[in-house]
Amino acid sequence: MQKLIMANWKMNGNSTSIKELCSGISQVQYDTSRVAIAVFPSSVYVKEVISQLPEKVGVGLQNITFYDDGAYTGEISARMLEDIGCDYLLIGHSERRSLFAESDEDVFKKLNKIIDTTITPVVCIGESLDDRQSGKLKQVLATQLSLILENLSVEQLAKVVIAYEPVWAIGTGVVASLEQIQETHQFIRSLLAKVDEKLAKNIKIVYGGSLKAENAKDILSLPNVDGGLIGGASLKAVEFNEIINQANKICTE
């Protein structure tokens, strides 16, 4: 399966640094049949990034509102996202859930706004350290996915990318063990299999959580890992490109 390597730049960068990043990423060589790339800049830089990257690199937004139009100061709608030429959308990132109190219902409502558009939704799920240590991992992940799996058709679900990001491994430098990643991705796939076996086999499940060049090969080689959602390591073109190179090699072998 093609690996999907995504860069979440979060609230980082300025016009100068983003121009340098785009220039660096534009230099990396990879087989587009084996690797797909997407970047998620801050919304104010989306048009700049689209204009500075090759067409083969997807560009996405980090968040939208679930309202269509109207008096919602500061918000961005799904229609606007499509209008400016975005390819991807992050939904339900752990920082949105924890810092802005986004609920599973909010995540579903946002997903529902774009599921029938040309935009690829990347739905983020993950557990806290307390959840894992108290044995609630499976319960938490199943709950986070329940509205989505119960209310979307198989055809709609097939458009979704799922990003598993253990909250305790995001921005901390702590990485889940290979065994933990593999077991969790397999569990997520088993939830999807209850809906449709073919869906479970073909849907992309990517890993996010302190993924960087030095551990990319091991993580991306796991059988149930279809790519990565990279945070801090994506802010340096050299390191992000090395992750892309590792993904390309894995898919070539």
Curated annotation (Swiss-Prot):
Protein residues bound to substrate: N8, W9, K10, G171, S210, G231, G232
Catalytic residues (UniProt): H93 (electrophile), E165 (proton acceptor)
GO biological process: gluconeogenesis; glyceraldehyde-3-phosphate biosynthetic process; glycerol catabolic process; glycolytic process
Chief location category: cytoplasm
Annotated metabolic or biological route of this protein: Carbohydrate biosynthesis; gluconeogenesis; Carbohydrate degradation; glycolysis; D-glyceraldehyde 3-phosphate from glycerone phosphate: step 1/1
InterPro entries, per database record: Aldolase_TIM (IPR013785), TIM_sf (IPR035990), TrioseP_Isoase_bac/euk (IPR022896), Triosephosphate_isomerase (IPR000652), Triosephosphate_isomerase_AS (IPR020861)
Enzyme Commission code(s) on record: 5.3.1.1
Annotated GO CC locations: cytosol
Catalytic activity: D-glyceraldehyde 3-phosphate = dihydroxyacetone phosphate
Entry's localization field: Cytoplasm
Keyword annotations: Cytoplasm, Gluconeogenesis, Glycolysis, Isomerase
One Pfam entry name: TIM
Alphabetized Gene3D superfamilies for the sequence: Aldolase class I
An example molecular function term from Gene Ontology annotations: triose-phosphate isomerase activity
CDD domains per record: TIM
UniProt record similarity statement: Belongs to the triosephosphate isomerase family.
Subunit composition and interactions: Homodimer.
NCBIfam families: tim
Function: Involved in the gluconeogenesis. Catalyzes stereospecifically the conversion of dihydroxyacetone phosphate (DHAP) to D-glyceraldehyde-3-phosphate (G3P).
UniProt-recorded name of the protein: Triosephosphate isomerase
Organism in which the protein naturally occurs: Francisella tularensis subsp. mediasiatica (strain FSC147)
UniProt lineage: Bacteria, Pseudomonadati, Pseudomonadota, Gammaproteobacteria, Thiotrichales
